[in-house]
């Protein structure tokens, strides 16, 4: 199928879908969740094919972890869809309004964006997360997954389209591009007449490619070079457990800790404790502030600007909070940054000075997630400042229109 035909179909479907209410949309969502559970064996078998292909291609373990589905992860995806169904539908909500001096009654109402193009790599969960959020908000979506998710996505898209049909909604509100040819992606990125927003979910290269080639607005985000600053007043034992969570719970995610900043005043005491704790968790430290032994490697400036997505952690000794903020400005990706401290004033200073979508005081960066923020599933974590920032839930997939009413009112 030509990309322009696919985009035109999506546009027509978005107009149709926008006319349906919450009841039918929720019916489709609940059917999706049910079918994910009932067809789990089929979905996991397809995923096993994708995993085998990825291993044969020499794809990294971090990417394979993102690609992997198991019973637990699939159940989690189904639960997320049910949670989306429980959320209030933002479409039609009146944001604000009133009656002006002219007598004009005016309201600002939430409406769907229209057609969303989502481009992602080895993340089959994105297929369902994005489809469910777009469905809930009355948006059509074009899903362009990577070649690594070919078999899994085929089954997942079939599940979604069948649920749409069962609920009496337009099947083509969710479509997939199955050919990984980048020429086709380039065509899609020029179809601003039909597509309203592009959301890339992948590495820095994918984001840069979309920014450079798209005539459609692009949401930039998902690159998480996340920092944590251990200030001298921090509870060191609690800090070690929090660092372990932020680094090791799921290393391949964008909200995982990548660089730890330790205040110089406590470095001599804290770093040996850190080294022991991380060694027990098979985490390799990259630092110039500890003697090079097993599990400790030299610090690499270039790697401090990138995600590890693995059990590797940069460790840098910093003079004070001001220097920590300067380091984050230089190396951070404006995703999630944290401070561990018992000093409330320093915590507020850190929050005020750090430029990031999410800033934490004595909490793990792993909380930067739509579900954890109470948004349901998310389409992305935006690190830009226009339209949306941080985890993008339902409201981020809407825009608004001004609805104005008068009694044959004319402007004087």
Swiss-Prot record:
Q: Which reaction does it catalyse?
A: L-glutamate 5-semialdehyde + phosphate + NADP(+) = L-glutamyl 5-phosphate + NADPH + H(+)
Has UniProt tagged this entry with the keyword NADP? yes
Entry's Gene3D superfamilies? Aldehyde Dehydrogenase, Chain A, domain 1, Aldehyde Dehydrogenase, Chain A, domain 2
Entry EC number(s): 1.2.1.41
Q: Name one GO cellular component term.
A: cytoplasm
Tell me if Zinc is a UniProt keyword of this record.
no
Q: Which GO terms describe its molecular function?
A: glutamate-5-semialdehyde dehydrogenase activity; NADP binding
> What top-tier enzyme class does this entry carry?
oxidoreductase
Q: What is its main location?
A: cytoplasm
| Alphabetically ordered keywords of this record | Amino-acid biosynthesis, Cytoplasm, NADP, Oxidoreductase, Proline biosynthesis
**UniProt GO BP:** L-proline biosynthetic process
Q: List locations, semicolon-separated.
A: Cytoplasm
The pathway noted for it is:
Amino-acid biosynthesis; L-proline biosynthesis; L-glutamate 5-semialdehyde from L-glutamate: step 2/2
SUPFAM superfamilies, from UniProt? ALDH-like (SSF53720)
Q: What does this protein do?
A: Catalyzes the NADPH-dependent reduction of L-glutamate 5-phosphate into L-glutamate 5-semialdehyde and phosphate. The product spontaneously undergoes cyclization to form 1-pyrroline-5-carboxylate.
Q: Which family does it belong to?
A: Belongs to the gamma-glutamyl phosphate reductase family.
Against NCBIfam families, the record matches this protein to: PRK00197.1, proA
The name on file for this protein is Gamma-glutamyl phosphate reductase
The organism is Actinobacillus pleuropneumoniae serotype 7 (strain AP76)
């Amino acid at each position: 199928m030509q990309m322009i035909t696919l985009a035109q179909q999506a546009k027509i479907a978005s107009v149709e879908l926008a006319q349906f209410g919450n009841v039918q949309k929720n019916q489709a969502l609940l059917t999706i969740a049910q079918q994910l559970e009932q067809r789990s064996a089929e979905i996991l078998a397809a995923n096993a094919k994708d995993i085998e292909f990825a291993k044969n291609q020499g794809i990294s373990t971090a990417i394979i972890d993102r690609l992997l589905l198991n019973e637990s992860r699939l159940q989690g995806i189904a639960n997320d869809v049910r949670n989306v169904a429980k959320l209030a539908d933002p479409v039609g909500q009146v944001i604000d309004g009133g009656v002006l001096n002219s007598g004009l009654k005016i309201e600002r109402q939430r409406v769907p964006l229209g057609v969303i193009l989502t481009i992602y790599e080895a993340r089959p969960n994105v297929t369902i997360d994005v489809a469910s959020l777009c469905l809930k908000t009355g948006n059509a979506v074009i899903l362009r997954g990577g070649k690594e998710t070919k078999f899994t996505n085929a089954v997942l898209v079939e599940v979604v389209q069948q649920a749409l049909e069962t609920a009496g909604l337009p099947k083509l509100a969710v479509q997939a591009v199955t050919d990984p040819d980048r020429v086709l992606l380039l065509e899609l990125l020029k179809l601003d007449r039909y597509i309203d927003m592009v959301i890339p979910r992948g590495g820095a290269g994918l984001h840069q490619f979309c920014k450079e080639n798209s005539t459609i607005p692009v949401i930039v985000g998902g690159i998480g070079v996340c920092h944590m600053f251990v200030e001298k007043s921090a509870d060191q034992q609690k800090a070690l457990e929090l660092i372990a969570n932020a680094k090791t719970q799921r290393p391949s995610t964008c909200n995982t800790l990548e660089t730890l900043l330790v205040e110089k005043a406590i470095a001599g005491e804290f770093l040996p404790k850190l080294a022991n704790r991380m060694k027990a968790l098979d985490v390799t430290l990259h630092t110039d502030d500890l003697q090079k032994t097993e599990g400790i490697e030299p610090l690499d400036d270039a790697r401090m600007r990138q995600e590890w997505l693995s059990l590797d952690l940069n460790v840098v000794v910093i003079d004070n909070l001001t220097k920590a903020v300067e380091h984050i400005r230089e190396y951070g990706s404006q995703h999630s940054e944290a401070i561990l401290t018992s000093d409330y004033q320093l915590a507020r200073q850190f929050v005020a000075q750090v430029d990031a979508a999410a800033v934490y005081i004595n909490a793990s960066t792993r909380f930067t997630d739509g579900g954890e923020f109470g948004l349901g599933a998310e389409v992305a974590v935006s690190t830009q400042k226009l339209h949306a920032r941080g985890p993008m839930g339902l409201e981020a997939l809407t825009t608004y229109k001004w609805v104005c009413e008068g009694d044959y009112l004319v402007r004087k």
